């Protein structure tokens, strides 16, 4: 069973996200700095009758990268073509996609850091010169043919900008860092989504869902649907603070947006390893989760919120973790004042 607080897209998200997506940049909630920059760049490109510079959107999953790509395509008057790094296995597949584009179209490549290197090299002339270099024949008879491409915009999305090669990263003219949303921004998103769903909700109910959504609109909309279900069965269909709290407690999503596995990790570090440090492999074995799952799924948000600290010797529980679980920290010297080390997006 998938986690309801999983930031990555789940099957149930696909259709609902389509209906909830804003169509214009001024309808997009949150990411104010990103919106302001993109609005200026889009207007400037349209005034010059040029395509928008190739754009890289990076940050945690679920923050609206695909939605922004769709908005950019609409603002530029082009179509949006969506694919992903893992889906393009051969250079010919990417070439086929590129040759179907028209002027001002947007090609959106999700997880662009996972592109095959041979495929990636096809992008270099496409991004720099709007051209595609194709080699025909083999050996001494081989010759290169250049095919002109339309003036399109490539939008790459990644959760790990540090994994992009320098040649690819340097070819993006616009780089936008997507940040976690505030509770107030998420409350606005929840209220808007409730209107689309035909669900009555109070401000307090919307804020309670927002607070437990891990700064992520995708999770907020997912929780809203489950709270709506609870309210329709258990009460008068109005999602109030009471219904929101009861539904979220039933879903085992606490007031920090943590689920039972998040709390299990914190409990293991504090109760079984005296607050740490504990090696990630030992922690993985102890809680029964794969090492990669802990590093990629659970740990990033706990690090970002400052509940655990990553050190060369292992993971340490911060003062916030002790407070959250109602424990007394008898080894505060280990907590390094609760500061999070490093950036987990650049691993």
UniProtKB/Swiss-Prot annotation:
GO terms for biological process: DNA recombination; DNA repair. It is an enzyme of class 3 (hydrolase). CDD domains: AAA. Keywords: ATP-binding, Cytoplasm, DNA damage, DNA recombination, DNA repair, DNA-binding, Hydrolase, Nucleotide-binding. Residues 182-252 are annotated as: Small ATPAse domain (RuvB-S). Mg(2+) binds at residue 66. Residues 328-347 are annotated as: Disordered. It is found in: Cytoplasm. Its main location: cytoplasm. Residues 1-181 are annotated as: Large ATPase domain (RuvB-L). Residues 255-347 are annotated as: Head domain (RuvB-H). InterPro entries: AAA+_ATPase, AAA_lid_4, DNA_helicase_Holl-junc_RuvB, P-loop_NTPase, RuvB-like_N, RuvB_C, WH-like_DNA-bd_sf, WH_DNA-bd_sf. Residues 329-339 have a biased composition (Low complexity). DNA binds at residues 310, 315. It catalyses: ATP + H2O = ADP + phosphate + H(+). Disulfide bonds: none annotated. ATP binds at residues 20-21, 62, 65-67, 128-130, 171, 181, 218. The RuvA-RuvB-RuvC complex processes Holliday junction (HJ) DNA during genetic recombination and DNA repair, while the RuvA-RuvB complex plays an important role in the rescue of blocked DNA replication forks via replication fork reversal (RFR). RuvA specifically binds to HJ cruciform DNA, conferring on it an open structure. The RuvB hexamer acts as an ATP-dependent pump, pulling dsDNA into and through the RuvAB complex. RuvB forms 2 homohexamers on either side of HJ DNA bound by 1 or 2 RuvA tetramers; 4 subunits per hexamer contact DNA at a time. Has 3 domains, the large (RuvB-L) and small ATPase (RuvB-S) domains and the C-terminal head (RuvB-H) domain. The head domain binds DNA, while the ATPase domains jointly bind ATP, ADP or are empty depending on the state of the subunit in the translocation cycle. During a single DNA translocation step the structure of each domain remains the same, but their relative positions change. Belongs to the RuvB family. HAMAP family: DNA_HJ_migration_RuvB. This is Holliday junction branch migration complex subunit RuvB. It comes from Clostridium beijerinckii (strain ATCC 51743 / NCIMB 8052) (Clostridium acetobutylicum). The gene is ruvB.
């Amino acid at each position: 069973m998938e986690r309801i607080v999983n930031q990555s897209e789940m099957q149930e998200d696909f259709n609902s996200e389509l209906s909830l997506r804003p169509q214009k940049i001024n309808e997009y909630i949150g990411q104010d700095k990103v919106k302001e920059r993109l609005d200026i760049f889009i207007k400037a490109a349209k005034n010059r009758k040029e395509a928008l510079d190739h754009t890289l959107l990076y940050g945690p999953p679920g923050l609206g990268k695909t939605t922004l790509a769709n908005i950019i395509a609409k603002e530029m008057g082009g179509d949006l073509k969506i694919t992903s790094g893992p889906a393009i296995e051969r250079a010919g597949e990417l070439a086929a996609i590129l040759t179907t584009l028209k002027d001002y179209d947007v090609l959106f490549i999700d997880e662009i850091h996972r592109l095959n290197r041979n495929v990636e090299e096809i992008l270099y002339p496409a991004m720099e010169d709007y051209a595609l270099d194709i080699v025909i024949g083999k050996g001494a008879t081989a010759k290169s043919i250049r095919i002109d491409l339309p003036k399109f915009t490539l939008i790459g999305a990644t959760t790990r900008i540090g994994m992009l090669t320098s040649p690819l990263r340097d070819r993006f003219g616009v780089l936008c860092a997507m940040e976690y949303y505030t509770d107030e921004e998420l409350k606005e998103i929840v209220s808007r989504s409730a209107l689309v769903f035909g669900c009555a909700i109070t401000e307090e109910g919307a804020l309670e869902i927002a607070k437990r959504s891990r700064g992520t609109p995708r999770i907020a909309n997912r929780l809203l649907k489950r709270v709506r279900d609870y309210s329709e069965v258990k009460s008068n269909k109005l999602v109030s603070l009471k219904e929101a709290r009861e539904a979220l407690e039933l879903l085992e999503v606490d007031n920090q947006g943590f689920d039972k596995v998040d709390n299990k990790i914190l409990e293991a570090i504090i109760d079984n390893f005296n607050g740490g440090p504990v090696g990630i492999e030992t922690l993985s074995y102890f809680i029964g989760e794969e090492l990669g799952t802990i590093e990629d799924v659970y740990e990033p948000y706990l690090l970002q919120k400052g509940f655990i600290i990553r050190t060369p010797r292992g993971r340490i529980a911060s003062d916030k973790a002790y407070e959250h679980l109602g424990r007394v920290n008898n080894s505060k010297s280990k907590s390094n004042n609760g500061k999070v080390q490093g950036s987990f997006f650049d691993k």
